[in-house]
């Protein structure tokens, strides 16, 4: 057992400072572990040389007592839809299979400047379109909590940031960056038993994040604890001149109170009743019920609230997603970068052939559907209509967070993240990508509609021994309170993110 | 320096056991929360809450050949199988489910940052000359140009 894996980021860097641990040996072991755990398929590309180089530089900085701060020498992984200078960035698609960006996404640049050691790029559904990390040209990512890795009897990692979640859950890195458009960070976090944060829209720069749905995409953070999540958020958040959709007010670094100092007595928790939908599993319901009770026992006021447009949200999300995808995917034509087909008969023919070869069926169908919904005769009926309903969904949240009567207001919403534990691959693959997204994203995509922050935290294991998680949501820019409550719950439930590793050993 | 054991910890990597962790685990299990015990009447609905909006009848979506050809031209991807057509139709059916929601006097929400003024920057060159870097990403170039086959030829359908 790598003892340092049990440490949080703060303790790890404390170990670097006092010389008990070294960034270089931690990075070397992480690379070694990643190669022993190849069966998980968490990484699509290891940045071995770069990682060792960065780790050496970090070790030197510690030796010189001029460390760059709380992430210096911390091993991280980044989802393969963030541009990384000199490291291939593929979106797990043939279209970008040999694309090496000439620049860093802002998130990557800030992590680099903070001294973090990039181990490699993680797997995802092609162009982040999916909820399972099963639609990748590099094959599916497996969940470390699986009872077995044989045939198709293993559990999916969730998606689309499944590689990032799997890497953190397996102890291959301390933190990973994902992206979240409709739940792509929180969904795999829930299935893999790690913390997954979707920050407020505009808090973290999207510059260099290959766009899926511009009006909803946010960089996400996956870690094994809430405190680690805060460390990463503090490094990447804040305005960016390169992304005009970042929130302009300066970012004030979060500092969470110690668990013993968290007082919930003035906290108002809302339970949105519409989140109990048909497919919710008994065990998730039981978990949701118990944690609500725990909060109430600690003095928080807990009450049921209504977000009446919740059930409509998944349809609106599907429309907006396909429309923005149709527009965003228009950039891939084979001329300036990415895959280029051999068809030289005409420009149009080259474009079409390039796209036929570069995109998978999921991407193609979303483009076609998006263009149908955007046809002049359909534009108002579908696209504009969806944007109007989107306002109703956002207003549902505003009503509970900003109600004029104080006794009707809530500070935090508590809901499930996913409707069940991680499904078996064979069960998941039995449904189409579109049908799966409608189920998988039910509880997560409303937060993206409204741009509000949301976090998934693991709570306990199901009878099958798989993580069950819950989601907290709060008003825009209320990350401080959101994560404080998450930290309190984390301390009560004492979920051990690395238990799967021990269990794999114990079961033999 | 603290000694980091080189032993692997996962069944895929090794077959060795790790007693200490098991032991620690056992202690932890003993004081685990009882998830069926509640101290307050719960506020979490114990039965599914039916959707507050009704489903329109499953209207049959028909798409004519002309529309399909138009979509293929606009999308520059081919609708190459019956399964793809079925998915397209079912996605449209799925989208139809919000048709009956009353949105009278509701403005479209294009961005959640609508209250923030979009920041404009001065029209000045801020980035360096990156011609070589950018051209390197292309598969075919000629001197400082991207190369494409002849244009203005309609797509064969």
Swiss-Prot record, chain B:
Q: Which GO terms describe its cellular component?
A: glutamyl-tRNA(Gln) amidotransferase complex; mitochondrion
Reaction(s) this enzyme catalyzes, per UniProt:
L-glutamyl-tRNA(Gln) + L-glutamine + ATP + H2O = L-glutaminyl-tRNA(Gln) + L-glutamate + ADP + phosphate + H(+)
Q: Where in the cell is it found?
A: Mitochondrion
Q: What EC number(s) has UniProt assigned to this enzyme?
A: 6.3.5.-
Q: Which GO terms describe its molecular function?
A: ATP binding; glutaminyl-tRNA synthase (glutamine-hydrolyzing) activity
**What's the protein name?**
Glutamyl-tRNA(Gln) amidotransferase subunit C, mitochondrial
Q: Which keywords fit this entry according to its UniProt record?
A: ATP-binding, Ligase, Mitochondrion, Nucleotide-binding, Protein biosynthesis
Coiled-coil segments on the chain, per record = none
Q: What does this protein do?
A: Allows the formation of correctly charged Gln-tRNA(Gln) through the transamidation of misacylated Glu-tRNA(Gln) in the mitochondria. The reaction takes place in the presence of glutamine and ATP through an activated gamma-phospho-Glu-tRNA(Gln).
Predominant cellular place of this UniProt entry's protein: mitochondrion
One GO term (biological process): mitochondrial translation
Query: Which Pfam families is this protein grouped with?
Result: GatC
Matching entries from InterPro entries are given as:
Asp/Glu-ADT_sf_sub_c (IPR036113), GatC (IPR003837)
- rRNA-binding as a keyword of this entry, yes or no, is no
State the remark under miscellaneous.
This protein may be expected to contain an N-terminal transit peptide but none has been predicted.
Outline the subunit composition: Subunit of the heterotrimeric GatCAB amidotransferase (AdT) complex, composed of A, B and C subunits.
Bilayer-crossing regions: none
Family in the record: Belongs to the GatC family.
